[in-house]
Regions:
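FAD/FMN-dependent oxidoreductases across multiple families
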Residues: 130-175
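Short hydrophobic core segments
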Residues: 1-7
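Hydrophobic/aromatic ligand-binding patch that stacks against planar heteroaromatic rings
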Residues: 3, 30, 166
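Acidic, glycine-rich active-site loops and adjacent beta-strand->loop/helix elements
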Residues: 9-11, 43-52, 180-182, 224-227
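Thiamine diphosphate
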Residues: 19-32, 38
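Flavin (primarily FAD) binding-site architecture
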Residues: 7-17
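An anion/pyrophosphate-binding glycine-rich loop and adjacent beta-alpha core
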Residues: 30, 36-148, 200, 209-218, ...
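Glycine- and aromatic-enriched mobile tails/lids
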Residues: 74-90, 101-104, 156, 162-176, ...
């Protein structure tokens, strides 16, 4: 009677991501193909400091708290650079830092920068960041003595399946919660540590709304058989895996942190060719990736500028609904409301 999408984001369509590799936008792609409303797919947030270690997917997250602790971003030759981009230096918000790192890497031809905490007390560093210390040490990096190689990575999708305050999508009896949904609460740039709003608060809203209307719905008498006419099984899966890698390469190169119409059009043309090659295959592993990437590029091409709206501004625009959202959020006492730099 009720279907709830909780399929996560689509960051695995990028070469570097902090998300699980199953985050290929499956649920969003299903709704997109079913003509449901998908919104703000261009609002993909990049975390500025993922551990740079070629071959690691997903990338290991180096928390922003390390910069709050006093970590300093430096180029590969050991020079600080954040003073060129923001007076807050390495303490600037994640979107500014991610763009700054991306710019430095492109101008210098580097594949990463460094985060330096070697000037901090070694024992204090180990105490505050034991997991990061152990992870880096396993790769031969002692963060109390060595710089940490970092690079931006796709981290969170602020867009997705458009839902209302009950987490209901534009398709009847279909709800979406968590990262696959687009609530509008995050605007175009989610703040740290508050993704639980969509995962918990909206899941609660979906449960209550669906239970209230459950008896009104009836089951379908029959589910039609899957129609695979005109498709075929690909006997060489290496071709599919290669296509998936091409999608990641295209998205990372042309639809990354900094975008232009020229880059987006190139990405569109290349993905269009790949889509034609793979459209005929049944049970295609990477089919969702194409749909998710296609949706992101389509919307980005139509967006003249990023519509970044802080939570406060969005709530003001919602009027009487704002109080309802705030009361729902406040009802979950374990949702973190303050950022602890340590």
């Amino acid at each position: 009677k009720i279907t709830v999408m909780a399929t996560g984001g689509c960051e695995a369509v990028y070469r570097q991501t902090t998300n699980p590799l199953v985050a290929t936008g499956d649920g969003i792609a299903m709704v997109y193909r079913a003509k449901g409303i998908v919104k703000d797919m261009e609002f993909i947030q990049f975390h500025p400091t993922a551990l740079y270690h070629p071959g690691d997917r997903p990338s290991y997250l180096i928390t922003e708290a390390m910069r709050g602790y006093g970590g300093i971003l430096k180029t590969k030759d050991g020079k600080e650079f954040m003073h060129k981009y923001d007076p807050r230096l390495s303490l600037a918000p994640r979107d500014i830092v991610a763009r700054a790192i991306d710019n430095e890497m492109k101008h210098r031809g580097d594949d990463h920068v460094y985060l330096d905490v070697t000037h901090k007390d070694p024992e204090e560093t180990k105490r505050h960041f034991p997991n990061i210390y152990e992870k880096c040490l396993s790769l031969g990096i002692d963060i109390t003595k060595d710089y940490i190689p970092v690079a931006p990575a796709a981290h969170y999708l602020c867009g997705g399946i458009l839902v209302d305050l009950n987490a209901a999508s534009s398709i009847h009896r279909l709800y979406a919660v968590g990262e696959c949904s687009c609530t509008g609460l995050h605007g175009g740039n989610r703040l740290a540590s508050n993704s639980l709003i969509e995962a918990v608060v909206y899941a609660d809203a979906a449960a209550k709304h669906s239970l209230a209307h459950f008896e009104e719905y009836s089951y379908k008498d029959e589910v039609p058989e899957w129609n695979d006419d005109g498709t075929k099984m690909n006997e060489e899966m290496v071709l599919i895996s290669q296509d998936a890698k091409e999608v990641q390469q295209i998205m990372s190169t042309y639809v990354g942190i900094v975008r232009t119409n020229l880059r987006l059009k190139r990405a569109w043309n290349r993905l269009d060719l790949l889509s034609e090659e793979t459209e005929c295959f049944c049970f295609l592993a990477g089919h969702e990736s194409f749909a998710a990437a296609e949706g992101a590029i389509k919307i980005a091409l139509n967006a003249n500028k990023v519509r970044v709206k802080p939570l406060r501004v969005i709530l003001n625009g919602l009027g009487k609904d704002a109080a309802m959202i705030i009361s729902r959020i406040n009802g979950f006492t374990y949702v973190q409301t303050e950022f602890d730099p340590y």
